[in-house]
UniProtKB/Swiss-Prot annotation:
Organism of this sequence: Rattus norvegicus
Protein name: Collagen alpha-1(II) chain
Name of the gene: Col2a1
GO biological process: anterior head development; bone development; cartilage condensation; cartilage development; cartilage development involved in endochondral bone morphogenesis; cellular response to BMP stimulus; cellular response to insulin-like growth factor stimulus; cellular response to mechanical stimulus
Domain Fibrillar collagen NC1: 1185-1419
UniProt biased composition (Pro residues): 89-104, 140-149, 365-374, 1001-1011, 1131-1148
Length: 1419
């Protein structure tokens, strides 16, 4: 790869930018067609003024490589590398001093063989059997003798004291695993274990609350552009635009009257260009330009928001047994036992197990140099390097093509008269030039010879009418001379003094729009606007590009204790301990703490282009046209006195350029001209001398990654640090799956204005400006960020091991491993290589709270949080007015028993009822006083229900009782008669946010009550649906800043504004202050959530919540009583043949002639002895016909059980079963028996064979249309049809011919066999609102419907309890019948079928309704 030095890179970069700019410039200039080439002029040696620089030439070919620059100064040391891999073992250390002598051993022998066998290479050193003979004097070492017979085993000597530790060698490479030890003896029986493992999981609990939304995911690729949305409504009228650029010239005015002929003047030389006129008024805005070409496809879009979590799947099959876990760490060694007394000599034993390890041998020789360690983490930025030497100047580029005509320079002073030129060839007539300022009249030239007649020039535009001159004296008539030859041009007259400026002309017609000017310098920062009203949260926008990397934070406090290292090599097994009691299985630990923040990710893709810049201000007027052709020579006139200033004539057409005049002498410097267009980028100048230090620069962009520094040396092992405060928040994880949407939160208070955002990303590169003057040298800038990764450096010297991290928290207890075999104790190995980071352990105990950190800058808005828990209950308010009568309450707990009543007469024995499901466990009542014991009477008949007593006074709220065990759900009781209105109940806990009501008139603020005791937290209610937006209330006092609201949707792009005028080009200003923030960059990835705000004051106590949803199913009840013995089953299959019986008595003689036709076989058994059933004689078949018929009948019955046909005799369990067995059957009425008992209770349903739904018909199916309810009360409330209205009834379902309650039992089973239910009802209305109130624009008067588990479904609110209107024809009072069709669909099958309906908009004499109840369908 070619490596370029800095100067060459700069030149290439400059050429690249210039080429790009040139291409852009060429696109921007749309020139007219090229004219024909003019004839060559005959101008001799006239040097024109120096032209403006030409446009940049094409990039030259790459010049030859420059000489190598001087070696730069040494860079700052690189960042510390990561710890290197463990090195090879070091050289052996010196041997330790000898241990003290052991006690005398038993009789000697030749131990050489045992010594030689005592080396165990795997243990890493020489392990000597500790078998000492009697201690003799040390002789010289003899050669090894032949192996002797093994001597008897000596007693184990006392262990020698450990030698001094040798110098620690470097860590050796990991050895291969040793062979498995022999299985150990069985250990002693363990103590009885603790309680067994946790039992099987209970039944599935109720659905949990939605989880908190996951952290925002990493930004995905940019999506393709969506289809165009529908056209939005017209926006509000925009602010008045800036004035437009000048319009095109108007058409010439009518021709004036012809002026008197003047004397024919001699054409003066072209005057110098006039001074720049004042800017004209801007013209109107030009029409919008043509639509640009379609852009290329965008990047892939960010992944969409995660869908709602699906329903919990069924539990999967149990997995196979996992692989055996890794062996645990070795236990700590036990204390050494005391030495025993010597015993008598034993018989020679078998060879003993290997003795205790000897002292570790000296370290080995140094190993070969290890491979380079892995790349270290990027270190901190090094200090800025010193400036390099200037590079060699590049070669001169090729001459560029001729530049465009520059603007006219200032008018020069008049030059001295030139020498007379030779006569030129006759030029083609030029177009008329613009009128130059009048020159002073030149001195009369000598009369020339008469010239030939020239060709007639084109007719000039009519001149303005001159003022009347003074009448001259009449001359004598001369003879007409013949036209002479044209004379030589006279000497050039002196340039006249410029005339005074004329009066300001009238404003001309608007010119054509100018080209866009360059953007002006940024204006001063405007005053901060008032905070706007908070908008509604929009849908989530696409994830923005990642924000700019923040500055490096301060070093964090010490981190938490590190995770456990990877298990070391399996140590030698200790001797088996007694078996401990089995521990109870621990609960799953809490999830571990978040990990540390990861390293910064790679730079993101480039951001999208910035918004189109603001319209520039109008450009300057163009330079004047070139001088026109020379006119015919006139007769010299006398110099007239200057006339008065004429009126300004209409603008003439532009002339074609004249030929160049002779070069004038240099005039004095004119005033500086207007700013010219930017010149091309010059070649880099030579390097200036170092300037003095400037002010501190802004933070630099991230540099390229520098080369990896040499790894630092390993530090010594540090002490275990204290547990640090929690680390910073981890980097955002990948986007989790989106949880189900949380309930809507209430609108937060308006947030305080945020701090000024960071400067946005730089816009696209502008055109290169002209080189500025050398600035003052800047001060040394901040250290830059780390550059991109350089080439890998040479491996550094091996560093010492780093300090081990603090011990991590204990991991989750693993399952008990299989019992390992007892291995021989190994010698201590060298420390193994550092393991990989283990998985996070379970949470340690919480550390002490760290000191509060400084408040961070406001982070970007976090993802929308869940609705918070209800606040502390506020103080009880003042007694409110009595509320509307409550709905019938749940039965209260049993009161204390009363004294026994007198015995009633014996009643008749009732029918045996169905065994009810166990009810919920009631609270225990107080025991009543014992009554006098009466004689047992007969069981009385049930008495009639008594009237409901008057409501009791409201009791004080009780303290929270212990939670009872959840009972099984009881079957619904029969509805009681409607109770009288009770007194207002105690205010309940705060419920969920209801639907947004219509705005009331603001009431006067009440005084806050004192704070009451904190109530028991109610069940979490369902979030209400968002109501329609009320009109704005009066502005409240400013609240404490609420949490940041959710990010709104990215609005649709507005219509493009009109193009502004082109401005004047300014001078290059001094370095400005940092500009105001640029247009927002794309949204960065969401930052971590900001710190929580201060806790708000307790909110007011909310209204009481709705009843909570049913509790989770209770534990499985005790087994029921033993059932009755079953009926006798069908006969079993025939048994195996019995053993042969004893021989029978001899039979009578047989007539063999019957079998004469069989013939006699020569070989084989007698054919009569082995008759098969299918070969039996026809006489045997008489009896088999019944058997065959029975078998066939049984076969048909079994087949019909396996594949029911939906008849009354053979019903299916559900329509889904019928569809599976007979997919080709059509939808229609079939019989099903969900409880699978006797088929006599089967019921007839409609089976939708396309979906498999079982639809049960209502009975009856209609509520007649009439006026069901009259009320003079003006207060509207929902009235239940079955419970309250006279003649109303609860809807029932199933076949009317079935025994009472049979349909309910069958429906209970059908609900259990189904996962989804749906039902439609049609509400026929006359002057009654069913769903949407068109006049009010809300759903306040919508019906309520009651499900079979007494849950009410509404038109709005929590989506799980809302129904939908498929058709709504009851939105206003028309005096005619209309209808609204309502559908409720739910996966909670217990809520269906619908059993009652409550309209609100009824009670008037002209308000009637009726209902068609549709079948309830289960799938």
């Amino acid at each position: 790869m070619i490596r370029l030095g800095a100067p060459q890179s700069l030149v290439l970069l400059t050429l690249l930018i210039a080429t790009v700019l040139q291409c852009q410039g060429q696109d921007a200039r749309k020139l007219g067609p090229k004219g024909q080439k003019g004839e060559p002029g005959d101008i001799k040696d006239i040097i024109g003024p120096k032209g403006p620089p030409g446009p940049q030439g094409p990039a030259g070919e790459q010049g030859p490589r420059g000489d190598r620059g001087d070696k730069g100064e040494r860079g700052a040391p690189g960042p510390r590398g990561r710890d290197g891999e463990p090195g090879t073992p070091g050289n052996p250390g010196p041997p330790g001093p000898p241990g003290p002598p052991g006690p005398p051993g038993l009789g000697g022998g030749n131990f050489a063989a045992q010594m030689a066998g005592g080396f165990d290479e795997k243990a890493g050193g020489a392990q000597m059997g500790v078998m000492q003979g009697p201690m003799g004097p040390m002789g010289p070492r003899g050669p090894p003798g032949p192996a002797g017979a093994p001597g008897p085993q000596g007693f184990q000597g006392n262990p020698g004291e450990p030698g001094e530790p040798g110098v620690s060698g470097p860590i050796g490479p990991r050895g291969p695993p040793g062979p498995a030890g022999k299985p150990g003896d069985d250990g002693e029986a363990g103590k009885p274990g603790k309680a067994g493992e946790r039992g099987l999981p209970g039944p599935q609990g109720a659905r949990g609350f939605p989880g908190t939304p996951g952290l925002p995911g990493v930004k995905g690729h940019r999506g393709y552009p969506g289809l165009d949305g529908a056209k939005g409504e017209a926006g509000a009228p925009g602010v008045k635009g800036e004035s437009g650029s000048p319009g095109e010239n108007g058409s010439p005015g009518p021709m004036g009257p012809r002026g008197l002929p003047g004397e024919r003047g001699r054409t003066g030389p072209a005057g110098a260009a006039g001074a720049r006129g004042n800017d004209g008024q801007p013209g109107p805005a030009g029409p919008p330009g043509p639509v640009g070409p379609a852009g290329g496809p965008g990047f892939l879009g960010a992944p969409g928001a995660k869908g709602e979590a699906g329903p919990t799947g069924a539990r999967g099959p149990e997995g196979a047994q996992g692989s055996r876990g890794e062996p645990g760490n070795p236990g700590s060694p036990g204390p050494a036992g005391a030495s025993g007394n010597p015993g008598t000599d034993g018989i020679p034993g078998a060879k003993g197990s290997a003795g205790a390890p000897g002292i570790a041998g000296a370290p080995g020789f140094p190993g070969p140099r290890g491979p380079p360690g892995p790349q270290g983490a990027t270190g901190p930025l090094g200090p800025k390097g010193q400036t390099g030497e200037p590079g060699i100047a590049g070669f001169k580029g090729e001459q560029g093509p001729k530049g465009e005509t520059g603007p006219a320079g200032p008018q020069g002073a008049p030059g001295p008269a030139g020498e007379e030129g030779k006569r030129g060839a006759r030029g083609e007539p030029g177009g008329a030039g613009p009128i130059g300022p009048p020159g002073e009249r030149g001195a009369p030239g000598n009369r020339g010879f008469p010239g030939q007649d020239g060709l007639a020039g084109p007719k000039g535009a009519p001149g303005e009418r001159g003022p009347s001159g003074l009448a001259g004296p009449k001359g004598a008539n001369g003879d007409p001379g013949r036209p002479g030859e044209p004379g030589l041009p006279g000497a050039r007259g002196l340039t006249g003094r410029p005339g005074d400026a004329g009066p300001q002309g009238k404003v001309g017609p608007s010119g054509a729009p100018g080209e866009d000017g360059r953007p002006g310098p940024p204006g001063p920062q405007g005053a901060r606007g008032q905070p706007g009203v908070m908008g509604f949260p929009g849908p989530k926008g696409a994830n923005g590009e990642p924000g700019k990397a923040g500055e490096k934070g301060l070093a964090g406090a010490p981190g938490l204790r590190g995770l456990p290292g990877k298990d070391g090599e399996t140590g030698a097994a200790g001797p088996p301990g007694p078996s401990g009691p089995a521990g109870e299985r621990g609960e799953q630990g809490a999830p571990g703490p978040s990990g540390f923040q990861g390293l910064p990710g790679p730079p993101g893709p480039p951001g999208e282009g910035g918004k189109q810049g603001d319209q520039g201000i109008p450009g300057e007027a163009g330079a004047p046209g070139l001088v026109g052709p020379r006119g015919e020579r006139g007769f010299p006139g006398e110099r007239g006195s200057p006339g008065a200033q004429g009126l300004q004539g209409p603008r003439g057409l532009p002339g074609t350029p004249g030929t160049d005049g002779p070069k004038g002498a240099a005039g004095p410097d004119g005033p500086p001209g207007a700013q010219g267009p930017p010149g091309l980028q010059g070649m880099p100048g030579e390097r200036g001398a170092a300037g003095i230090a400037g002010p501190k620069g802004d933070r630099g962009d991230v540099g390229e990654k520098g080369p990896e520094g040499a790894p630092g040396k390993d530090g010594g092992r540090g002490l275990t640090g204290p547990i640090g405060p929690p680390g910073p928040a981890g980097a955002n994880g990948e986007k989790g799956e989106v949880g189900p949407p949380g309930p809507s939160g209430s609108t937060g208070a308006r947030g305080a204005p945020g701090e000024r955002g960071e400067t946005g990303p730089p816009g696209p590169a502008g055109f290169a400006g002209p080189p500025g003057a050398d600035g003052q040298p800047g001060a040394k800038g901040d250290q830059g960020e780390a550059g991109q990764k350089g080439d890998a450096g040479a491996p550094g010297p091996q560093g010492p091991s780093g300090a081990p991290g603090p011990q991590g928290p204990t991991g989750v207890t693993g399952p008990k491993g299989a019992r390992g075999a007892q291995g021989p104790p190994g010698a201590t190995g060298f420390p193994g290589a550092a393991g990989r980071v283990g998985p996070p352990g379970s949470n340690g105990n919480p550390g002490p709270a760290g000191p509060p950190g400084p408040a961070g800058k406001d982070g970007p808005k976090g993802a929308r949080g869940d609705t918070g828990a209800p606040g502390r209950a506020g103080d009880p308010g003042l007694q409110g007015p009595a509320g509307a009568p409550g709905e019938k309450g749940e039965p209260g707990d049993d009161g204390p028993s009363g004294s026994d009543g007198p015995p009633g007469p014996q009643g008749l024995a009732g029918q045996r009822g169905i065994v009810g499901l166990p009810g919920q466990r009631g609270e225990r009542g107080f025991p009543g006083l014992p009554g006098p014991s009466g004689e047992p009477g007969k069981q009385g008949a049930p008495g009639a229900s008594g009237d409901r007593g008057p409501p009791g006074p409201v009791g004080p709220p009780g303290l929270t009782g212990p939670a009872g065990e959840p009972g099984r759900e009881g079957s619904p009781g029969a509805d009681g008669p409607p109770g009288r209105d009770g007194a207002a109940g105690v205010k309940g806990d705060r419920g969920e946010t209801g639907a947004l009501g219509a705005p009331g008139a603001p009431g006067p603020p009440g005084s806050p009550g004192p704070a009451g005791p904190t109530g028991k937290q109610g069940d979490r209610g369902e979030a209400g649906a968002q109501g329609p937006m009320g009109p704005s209330g009066p502005a409240g006092a400013r609240g404490i800043a609420g949490p940041q609201g959710p990010r709104g949707d990215k609005g649709e792009a507005g219509e493009p504004g009109e193009r502004g005028l082109k401005g004047h080009r300014g001078f290059t200003g001094l370095q400005g202050l940092p500009g105001p923030p640029g247009p927002s960059g794309d949204q960065g990835t969401s930052g971590p959530a900001g710190p929580s705000g201060p806790r708000g004051p307790p909110g007011p106590v909310g209204p009481s919540g709705k009843d909570g949803s049913n509790g989770i199913p209770g534990p499985i009840g005790p087994p029921g009583p033993r059932g009755r013995s079953g009926e006798t089953g069908p006969a079993g299959p025939p048994g195996n043949p019995g053993p042969p019986g004893p021989p029978g008595p001899p039979g009578p003689g047989i007539d063999m002639s019957a079998f004469a036709g069989l013939g006699q076989r020569e070989k084989g058994p007698d054919p009569l002895q082995y008759m098969r059933a299918d070969e039996a004689d026809s006489t045997l078949r008489q009896h088999d016909v019944e058997v065959d018929a029975t078998l066939k009948s049984l076969n048909n019955q079994i087949e019909s059980i396996r594949s029911p046909d939906g008849s009354r005799k053979n019903p299916a369990r559900t329509c889904q079963d019928l569809k599976l067995c007979h997919p080709e059957w059509k939808s229609g009425d079939y019989w099903i028996d969900p409880n699978q008992g006797c088929t006599l209770d089967a019921m007839k349903v409609f089976c939708n064979m396309e979906t498999g739904e079982s639809c049960v018909y209502p009975n009856p199916a209609t509520v007649p249309r009439k006026n069901w309810w009259s009320s003079k009360s003006k207060e509207k409330k929902h009235i239940w049809f079955g419970e309250t209205m006279n003649g109303g009834f609860h809807f029932s379902y199933g076949d009317g011919n079935l025994a009472p309650n049979t349909a309910n039992v069958q429906m209970t089973f059908l609900r259990l066999l189904s996962t989804e239910g749906s039902q439609n009802i049609t509400y026929h209305c006359k002057n009654s609102i069913a769903y949407l109130d068109e006049a009010a624009g809300n759903l306040k008067k919508a019906l309520l419907i009651q499900g079979s588990n007494d849950v009410e479904m509404r038109a709005e609110g929590n989506s799980r309890f809302t129904y939908t209107a498929l058709k709504d024809g009851c939105t206003k009072h028309t005096g005619k019948w209309g209808k609204t069709i309502i559908e409720y669909r739910s996966q909670k099958t217990s809520r269906l079928p619908i059993v009652d309906i409550a309209p609100m908009d009824i009670g008037g004499p002209d308000q009637e309704f009726g209902v068609d109840i549709g079948p309830v369908c289960f799938l």
